[in-house]
Amino acid sequence: MEEFQGYLELDRYQQHDFLYPLIFREYIYALAHDHGLNRSILLDNVGYDTKYSLLIIKRLISRMYQQNHLIISANDSNQNQFFGYNKNLYSQMMSEGFAVIVEIPFSLRLVSSLEATEIVKSYNLRSIHSIFPFLEDKFPHLNYVSDVLIPYPIHLEILVQTLRYWVKDPSSLHLLRFFLHEYYNWNSLITPKKIIFSKSNPRLFLLLYNSHVCEYESILLFLRNQSSHLRLTSSGIFFERIHFYEKKKYPVPVEKVFVNDFPAAILWFFKDPFMHYVRYQGKSILSSKDTPLLMNKWKYYLVNLWQCHSYVWSQPGRIYINQLSKHSLDFLGYFSSMRPNLSVVRGQMLENSFIMDNAMKKLDTLVPIIPLIGSLAKVKFCNALGHPISKSTWADSSDFDIIDRFVHICRNLSHYYSGSSRKKSLYRIKYILRLSCVKTLARKHKSTVRTFLKRLGYKLLDEFFTEEEQILSLIFPRASYTLKKFYRGRIWYLDIFCINDLVNHE
C-alpha cells in the first residue's frame, strides 16, 4: 500500500470515485508486474519476467489512446502480433493493471482499518500449519460435517453488478465488461481452478470471486447473528496480503468483518458453540456438535440464499451431511480425518492400583498421495503409476538450472506438507522428484542413471536432503510493546501467500 499512496493522488480520485484514468499510468503496470513476480516465487516460472518491459507498456498505453486499436475481436487468432507480442500478453497486461486499480478502494479501507486497530505488519511470518490448531481444538468435539461446493453465478454480469457496491466509477465497470466479453473463455469460469488460480489472469478473477462470495457471506453472517444470541468469534486468514490479524474475541459488526476480510482472502470462517463455517477457495465446510436437524437448517439457509439473492442454482440434495468420525475433509491440500488415539494411564491410590484406558480423538492430517501423483504426472515428472521419468522440456537447460528447478519444487512441497502427521507419502513425492531430476540430467548427457551417478557422485543431490529448518527462518521478534498485546490471544501466521499448482490438484 505504500506504493499506492506514494504514486496516486488519492484525495482527488477518492473525491470523485474516478479510477478509469489510472489505466493509462505506467506505474500501475509496474505494480502489477511486481505482484506477479512475488507470486512466481512458489510457482514454476514460465517466462513471465522476460516478456515484460517498459517499452511494451509505453506502446500498450499509446495504443489504448487510439480507440480503434483498443478493441480486438475475440475471434482473432491468439497469435496475431501486437508490436511483436501476441494478444494473450496484451490482454494479460491490461487485466492485471485493471485489477490493481479496482483493488484501490478495498486497499484504502484495509489500511484505515489497520491503523484504527493498531495492527502492525511483519515480513517474517510463520508456517501455514499454524492454522490447524483451530481444527485440532474444535473439530474433535463435533459430530457432523458437510462439504459444500460454492456455486458460480449463471452470468458474468452478476459479478459486475456485485462490484458496483464497491467501485462507483462507471467507466471502470464498462472496461471490466470489455475484459469479460472479449478476452476470456466463458465456459472456463465454471471451473474455479482454470480461472481463479490461473497463471494468466489470477488477480482480476480472484477479486471478482471474492466480491461475489463476500456479498452472500455478509448476509449469512447476519442470519447467524439473528439465530443466536451468543458471542461471535470470527477469524480471517489472508494469502494475498503480508499482514497478520488478531483473532477477534468480541462481537464484530458485519460491515467491519467483511471490509477487513475482503481484499484478497480465500479463507474465512466463523464459529460458535453450535455451528462452524469454514471457506477455502471454492469450497465451504459446515460442522456442528448438535443433531443433523441443525445442519439441515443451515443447509437450506445456504441454498435459499444462493438461489434468491445471488442468482445461482444449487440443490439441497447435493449437500451431504456426514458423521465426522467416518468422513475425511479435503482442507488446505490435506486429507484431514478424526482417528482415536488410545492411551493407557496407570494410577495408584494407597495400596490399590488401577489402569484406565483413555480414548481421545486426534486430528489426522494426511498427504493426498494419489492426487499429487496425478499432478506430477500431468507436468511430466512421472507416469500415471508414479514411476519417475525425465523432464524432456528441461533437458536443454544447464545442470544448475535443472537441479535448481527440481529443488525449488521439492522444498516447496516439503514445506507445505511438513505438517502432516504421517510423512511416508511426502517421502515418496520427494523420491519421485529426486529420481526425475537424475533422469533428466542423464538424458541431457546421453547417459544412464547409474553411470551418471557413478561419474558425478551422490553429492549432486545434497540439495534435496537439506533440512527445512536450515532454509526457513521462523523467528518472530517480541520486543515491541504493541506486539505483546497480541500474544495474549491466538494469532495465526502465514508465509505461503500463493498455493503451488501441484497442491491445487483436481
Swiss-Prot record:
It is found in: Plastid, Chloroplast. InterPro entries: Domain_X, Maturase_MatK, Maturase_MatK_N. Keywords: Chloroplast, mRNA processing, Plastid, RNA-binding, tRNA processing. The keyword ATP-binding does not apply. One of its GO terms (molecular function) is RNA binding. GO terms for biological process: mRNA processing; RNA splicing; tRNA processing. GO terms for cellular component: chloroplast. Belongs to the intron maturase 2 family. MatK subfamily. Usually encoded in the trnK tRNA gene intron. Probably assists in splicing its own and other chloroplast group II introns. This is Maturase K. It comes from Crataegus monogyna.
